[in-house]
């Protein structure tokens, strides 16, 4: 009690230290209860689908996060007394991949889930919090469209477990494999690939058209790249979109990526997901990290995606255990205010 009183006095005398660091927050009382209810609801649905929880450490070798999407550039780093470069947890998937590759090697398939916070550096101007609350699942050792469909179905079930009805849930599905094949066929440099990714991600059709006209040689690859800035299509409209994309495929790699996406969509449709599926070939984030299926989750009332994931078949190999994997994470900061868990 005396220590608490002393700390309170120190806080009053030093108001700069009284607030949590920029981009973080205290969760008190009802906010804490709501978060725990949501986490419990998600844990139930994950375990009902055969997933087991793993709890990675909150601090890792910085090298682990160098394998994450973005290369770990936004990880908060520190050097310990032995001179080791460490980082606060910036990405759960990289940690789960490390666990699967080093602790659970040879066990397939693995169905693992997690919940907790990640910490990433961000500027005050961006409005993006440094600390973000997440929960998610990873399926390791399964490569087929059935595994992709399983994760899409579990993502939809997760939203439903939080009280988000099917009519208020939407999953935008694409494949980074098609975009990778297009930029390879176009001979795009890293600089051009980044510029194309940015224009496609913003759905900037005029800007993308101008960029392609100036820097991409005429041909199927250029026409297909421009098409990627089009709005998402409903699943009912997807066949026409995929057919057009196939016609513009500059080679077998692009065609194969589209076929894998079509197979995953067919398998997902057979599962009656309980969420509206949209096909968005402009889902091109995570180039160099994701290898096939990519998707974002949306909920009515949220201004941005509330989760996302995809297939990352090369990540475990970077830890010495090459196995395919697919997974997703949920943004609990965005979902908890919307949730009505049962």
Question: Model-predicted segments: where are they?
Answer:
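Short acidic (Asp/Glu) and glycine-rich catalytic loops that position anionic groups and cofactors
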Residues: 20-22, 72-75, 204, 220, ...
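Short, well-structured alpha-helical patches and their helix-loop capping segments
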Residues: 88, 107-110, 129-131, 140-151, ...
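Acidic, His- and aromatic-enriched active-site or binding-groove loops in soluble protein domains
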Residues: 74-82, 187-212, 273
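Positively charged, Gly/Ser-enriched RNA/tRNA-binding surfaces
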Residues: 2, 31-32, 37-49, 60-61, ...
